[in-house]
Amino acid sequence: MIYLNKYRHITEEAEKSLYSLVKDLINKNTTNILEVGTMAGQVTVILAGAAAEKNESVNVISIDQNYDTFSPTAAESLQANNLFNCSFESDKLEERFEENIIKANIIYIDRFHDKIGSKMELIKKNAIVPTKVIYRNPKASSNFPFEVTEVSPQVKPRQRKKSTENTKAATKVSAK
């Protein structure tokens, strides 16, 4: 993988690990991978590469806020890798994240480290298909930096209509 930005926030070993993990998680029902990142593009390239290799129809939706205007963007790194299965959204990260949860089968959270608990609750509330959530745990990044959780939508059984019993005596009708 060609990654144009010099800033790397995960090691090469973690890159390989994430690449294989995502490839293993993608199945025939996977349509979108949602990534909330940091605009450097390292993880975006990994996710898009794994998705393209496993199933060309899987798209990556990357929600990022660009704080670094001097370094190459994720889009430039994707282009260098001939990966075009990615769309970008920026601005209003919280809103964009919530709006896109329903589109994703796999969610990678590389931002919101302090808010993982509240983000998981949001995902549980909004997921409409079984969703695998991968997030970085910076405190444990020396070993295996990723945690994976599966969230299944809460399907409530439909309430049956109460039948109203007719207690009146039925009137016989004869056919002539």
Residues covered by each model-derived region:
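S-adenosyl-L-methionine
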Residues: 1-4, 8-9
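S-adenosylmethionine/decaboxylated-SAM
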Residues: 3, 15-162, 166-168
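Positively charged N-terminal leader segments that act as targeting/secretion signals
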Residues: 169-174
